[in-house]
């Protein structure tokens, strides 16, 4: 699952 984890981190960083 490459990209999914990165997307999750991006969402948390935006918060």
Curated annotation (Swiss-Prot):
GO BP term, example: proteolysis
Role played: Snake venom serine protease that potently induces platelet aggregation. Its aggregatory activity is partially inhibited by monoclonal antibodies against GPIb and the thrombin receptor. Its ability to induce intracellular Ca(2+) release is blocked by pretreating platelets with thrombin. Hydrolyzes thrombin chromogenic substrate CBS 34.47, but shows very weak coagulant activity. Can hydrolyze fibrinogen alpha-chains.
TM stretches of this protein: none
Domain of life: Eukaryota
Main location group: secreted
Domain (Peptidase S1) ranges: 1-15
Organism (species): Cerastes cerastes
Family according to the record: Belongs to the peptidase S1 family. Snake venom subfamily.
Molecular function terms, GO-annotated: serine-type peptidase activity; toxin activity
Protein name (database record): Snake venom serine protease IVa
UniProt keyword terms in alphabetical order: Hemostasis impairing toxin, Hydrolase, Platelet aggregation activating toxin, Protease, Secreted, Serine protease, Toxin
UniProt GO cellular component terms: extracellular region
Cell compartment(s), UniProt: Secreted
Enzyme Commission number(s) from the entry: 3.4.21.-
Modes of activity regulation: Inactivated by p-APMSF, leupeptin, iodoacetamide, protein kinase C inhibitor, phosphatase inhibitor, ATP and PGE1. Is insensitive to acetylsalicylic acid, ADP scavenger system, protein kinase A inhibitor and hirudin.
Quaternary structure (record): Dimer (it is unsure whether homo- or heterodimer).
Tissue specificity: Expressed by the venom gland.
């Amino acid at each position: 699952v490459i990209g999914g984890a990165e997307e999750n981190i991006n969402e948390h960083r935006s918060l």
